[in-house]
A protein has these predicted regions:
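Bacterial signal peptide processing site
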Residues: 1-2
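Long, acidic low-complexity intrinsically disordered regions
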Residues: 9, 13, 20-23, 37
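Divalent cation-coordinating acidic motifs and surrounding scaffolds
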Residues: 25, 29-327
Length: 327
């Protein structure tokens, strides 16, 4: 989707918002283990309740995504604040951002005679084609650390701890997220968020020594948020194959997974490029629907993603309530 889309003002669809008390806080907090001393009455089922959350954001970095990335970054502070207020697991979360390609327009060696070089790489300071990138920086599915090209941060983002993902101890989490999530618009025009997602969750990239080593934890729930405005079907594979890959990454535990997608919504006038043959997000909608109550579909064209993330927190809260850690 390299054609800009006009924001709409219609609301997102999905799960109901959580019930709140007089303070405005959710009254459906997650359940946590209580030691069984014989006569003590426990709250919730034994061994239920998440204590860890791994957040994966998959962000389209193609030419039409500048405003969408800005909306996502603007919604993040409210989202993470609500997570920290709602989930007791908020003291042990990890946040990773990946983009949708491995060979954007500023991939070396740059062709200095091409319009891509002029329009997406040389225009930024410093020239994106001179960026010193390591192997993980050019691997699809690896956590973003150094966005390059037009409208990107164009710097090495200051993630504390040497990982390609952020922890709660990040000194300025909101600023660091804004840095990595501003992946820019110099990505390959073939947008493949599903492939970025499945590769980010692969056993190889998460193994010791891998680009994302330590990110994917067996005893955490996995929350995937992906965003793309592409009306076409560029991803390799099928919704069933993407579903199977994500499920396998959590050892078949569907209850440990939440999937939220900001995608084209033709019924809302969003990302309709006039091509009657284009799926316009239907393949992604099918994938999201496979997760049942743990799936949420929203419109990428909304100017404000806050209502979408409010709905997402309610779903994450429910997943946290019912999660049974392995072992």
């Amino acid at each position: 989707g390299d054609s800009p889309t006009e924001p709409t003002t219609s609301g997102t669809s999905g799960a109901s918002l959580p019930a709140t008390d007089d303070t405005g806080m959710s009254d459906t907090l997650p359940k946590f283990d209580v030691l069984d001393t014989g006569d003590v009455i426990t709250t919730g089922a034994p061994d239920m309740g998440c204590k860890k959350v791994d957040f994966l954001f998959v962000i389209d970095n193609s030419a039409s995504m500048e405003d969408n990335q800005a909306a996502l970054i603007a919604s993040f502070p409210g989202f993470i604040d609500t997570i920290e207020q709602t989930l007791s697991a908020s003291n042990d979360y990890q946040i990773m951002v990946v983009d949708t390609d491995d060979d954007g327009r500023c991939k070396k060696p740059c062709d200095t005679n091409s319009s891509d070089y002029t329009d997406f790489c040389a225009i930024v300071k410093p020239n994106a084609c001179n960026a010193k990138l390591d192997a993980c920086d050019t691997t699809r599915g690896a956590g973003v650390v150094h966005p390059v090209g037009l409208y990107s941060s164009n710097v090495v983002c200051p993630i504390t701890g040497g990982n390609r993902y952020m922890l709660p101890a990040e000194p300025d989490l909101q600023s660091t997220f804004a840095c990595v999530a501003r992946v820019g618009t110099a990505g390959n025009p073939s947008e493949r968020p599903m492939n970025g997602m499945t590769e980010a969750l692969s056993s190889t990239i998460n193994a010791p020594g891998g680009c994302n080593a330590g990110f994917l934890r067996d005893d955490a729930i996995l929350v995937i948020t992906f965003i793309s405005d592409d009306p076409n079907y560029e991803d390799k594979g099928t919704p069933q194959e993407w579903y199977d890959a994500v499920l396998a990454s959590k050892q078949g535990n569907k209850d440990a997974i939440v999937v939220a997608g900001l995608i084209p919504q033709p019924a809302m006038g969003c990302a309709d490029n006039g091509d009657p043959g284009a799926p316009k997000g239907s393949h992604w909608a099918e994938f999201i629907a496979m997760w049942g109550d743990h799936g949420l579909s929203g419109s990428v064209c909304e100017a404000d993603y806050s209502p979408f993330f409010t709905q997402a927190v309610a779903i994450i809260d429910d997943a946290c309530d019912n999660f049974v850690p392995p072992g």
